[in-house]
């Protein structure tokens, strides 16, 4: 038995929700370790769809403990709203099945407003990143700047007042620069104290709790959000998120040591998608790209934004295998490729006429690379609902084997529809 870390190996939206749900049924504890309510995922259980943004997937399954780690930035109002939405669907969330790290940073209204003001200004200047405007980046900035307000601060109104007084000069200076009105101390205090009684019952010393769970032999599932190519260090900077999204963050963002992480499962879509701005070497703007988007229902869970679509990029996933230490991948949405006459896989790039085997880190170079493709024959048969290798067309199996060879990691799971049971299991990550 081992613990499992689930990460996205592309730009997010790889289908982590289904795989995490499949794994969480067998886990005891499910931990979120980075990001905030900017990355959504949909779980389909017994025909009911649950859309989660902040809460760990384990929260919808009875008998599981869901944990929001210290690496997550928590919008308390979004948290309360998501809990209420689940309650309306018959899912009860209490401290018996959800704990939040007492040292997790809070997202405030001024973070959301700053995020929006920056995006508006960047849109006008042509430097837009394409954030969700939910205050994630500004909250992380305050965390790194050592002025953040954390979950535990809600329990001490007097100390909270001092911390609000410390954070406001920074934000009001920025707001003046954008021509926005300053924020009053009383506004933020009222905003926070109004949610304190609803948030504080969930607070926990998470590192200690997880250490106890580890010692008793609990199965722990670490649930990543977004994708490795959006990592603040290893992604396509500056078109990235504001946190580390690679597997190593599961340790730092939860308080467990790296030796406890175990199997690293990289969720990998059988083609490539991206939301928002930034480089995308294999992007297709033709009818094939439109086909992938429509058949794959490529619209964001949180924002509803249309995703950009393209061929599978083995060079980028190979980088993710290395930066995450991926043990095996879960290949998703293979069924979306059904019916295409031919398929292409990017194996490297040409940069100024020179062949290279990885995407360069420099933004200007990323904009100039041209993909180098291998072409494979497609298949006409349906792979939807396949649950064993024998159900797959020969060309589909050939495609999967080619992906494995090019990225340097084996397929542990193969997903053939949004339904959780439509999965071919090759290797059980919990038993590896």
Curated annotation (Swiss-Prot):
GO terms for molecular function: adenylosuccinate synthase activity; GTP binding; magnesium ion binding. It catalyses: IMP + L-aspartate + GTP = N(6)-(1,2-dicarboxyethyl)-AMP + GDP + phosphate + 2 H(+). GTP binds at residues 12-18, 40-42, 307, 333-335, 415-417. Substrate binds at residues 301-307. GO terms for biological process: 'de novo' AMP biosynthetic process; IMP metabolic process. Gene3D superfamilies: Adenylosuccinate Synthetase, subunit A, domain 1, Adenylosuccinate Synthetase, subunit A, domain 2, Adenylosuccinate Synthetase, subunit A, domain 3. The active site is at 13 (proton acceptor), 41 (proton donor). NCBIfam families: PRK01117.1, purA. Belongs to the adenylosuccinate synthetase family. This is Adenylosuccinate synthetase. It comes from Allorhizobium ampelinum (strain ATCC BAA-846 / DSM 112012 / S4).
């Amino acid at each position: 038995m081992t613990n499992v870390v689930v990460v996205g190996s592309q730009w997010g939206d790889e289908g982590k929700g289904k795989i995490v749900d499949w794994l969480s049924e067998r886990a005891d504890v499910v931990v979120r370790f980075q990001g905030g309510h900017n990355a959504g995922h949909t779980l389909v259980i017994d025909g009911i769809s649950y859309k989660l943004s902040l809460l760990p997937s384990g929260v919808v399954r009875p008998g599981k403990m869901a944990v929001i780690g210290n690496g997550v930035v928590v919008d308390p109002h979004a948290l309360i709203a998501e809990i209420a939405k689940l309650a309306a669907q018959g899912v009860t969330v209490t401290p018996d099945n959800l704990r939040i790290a007492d040292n997790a940073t809070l997202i405030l209204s001024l973070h959301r407003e700053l995020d929006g003001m920056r995006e508006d200004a960047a849109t006008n200047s042509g430097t837009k990143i394409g954030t969700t405007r939910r205050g994630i980046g500004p909250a992380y900035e305050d965390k790194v700047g050592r002025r953040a307000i954390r979950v535990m601060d809600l329990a001490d109104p007097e100390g909270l007042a001092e911390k609000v007084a410390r954070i406001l000069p920074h934000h009001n200076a920025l707001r003046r620069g954008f021509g926005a009105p300053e924020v009053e101390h009383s506004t933020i205090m009222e905003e926070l104290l109004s949610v304190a009684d609803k948030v504080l019952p969930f607070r926990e010393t998470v590192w200690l709790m997880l250490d106890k769970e580890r010692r008793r032999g609990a199965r722990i599932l670490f649930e990543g959000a977004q994708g490795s190519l959006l990592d603040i260090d290893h992604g396509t900077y500056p078109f990235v998120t504001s946190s580390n999204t690679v597997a190593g963050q599961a340790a730092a963002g939860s308080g467990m040591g790296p030796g406890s992480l175990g199997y690293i499962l990289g969720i990998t879509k059988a083609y490539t998608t991206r939301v928002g701005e930034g480089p995308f070497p294999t992007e297709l703007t033709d009818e094939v790209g439109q086909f992938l988007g429509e058949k794959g229902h490529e619209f964001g869970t949180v924002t509803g934004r249309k995703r950009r679509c393209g061929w599978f990029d083995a060079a980028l996933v190979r980088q993710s295998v290395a930066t995450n230490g991926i043990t095996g991948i879960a290949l998703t949405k293979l069924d979306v490729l059904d019916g295409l006459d031919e398929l292409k896989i990017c194996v490297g790039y040409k940069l100024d006429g020179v062949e290279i085997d990885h995407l360069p880190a420099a933004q200007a170079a990323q904009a100039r690379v041209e993909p180098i493709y291998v072409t494979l024959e497609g298949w006409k048969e349906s792979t939807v609902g396949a649950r064993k290798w024998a159900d797959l067309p020969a060309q589909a199996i050939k495609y999967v084997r080619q992906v494995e060879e090019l990225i340097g990691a084996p397929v542990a799971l193969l997903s053939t529809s949004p339904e959780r049971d439509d999965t071919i299991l090759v290797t059980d990550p919990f038993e590896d």
